[in-house]
Amino acid sequence: KDKVIFVIQKQEEHLFPDKNTLVVEDNIGIAKTREIIYKTAGKKRYLVVDDDVLLHRRNATYFSEPSNMEGSKRKLTDNDWNELLQRLNYQHDNNHIICGFKFSAILPRFNQPTFYNGGVFAIFSIDGEQLSKVIDEIDFNYVPIQEDVHFNLELLTRGYPNAIMEEFCYHQKYNNDGGCNTFRTQQMEDMCAEKLNKKFPKYYTIDYSKT
């Protein structure tokens, strides 16, 4: 409990009477909410986690180690959490500003428990000390959605590498009711894609033949 802060809107305060909370204004959107989280956390190291995410650990056999569980993956244990935090700190100590996780439905890279410079979504660890050097240069509200793609590209194009856990992975159901789906539209998706393409034309392209 002491290590978890729920980021909630004012209209939700009554639902979290005994929790540590960071309260933001109602209906400000995911991009502005993320900006507030980053700037409030400052130079700490911290995890940002969507509220519908589950974490799993994959069987060590994927990485040429003896099996450490039944099946291909399982939910994290307390010992897994301790090991995961050690690995995240190791990556941050080695200048990886942000660390993410592989989506559980995608097979891992064999014999590679960590890979580098990919997309980071849904759950990630941030080194606030490194982020503090560029945080004021980033327009976190450039797009109202796809803000995670924008954040990834802002950091990568500035030369800040990331690390992505293969052995530890996340599960998330997409298009659940609530959240961004209360205001996301196809028109908004298209507008954000065009803005990202304009800002990062070398790395974000649009295939108009499929539209």
Role assignments for model-derived ranges:
Residues L55-V149:
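Conserved catalytic core of nucleotide-sugar-dependent glycosyltransferases
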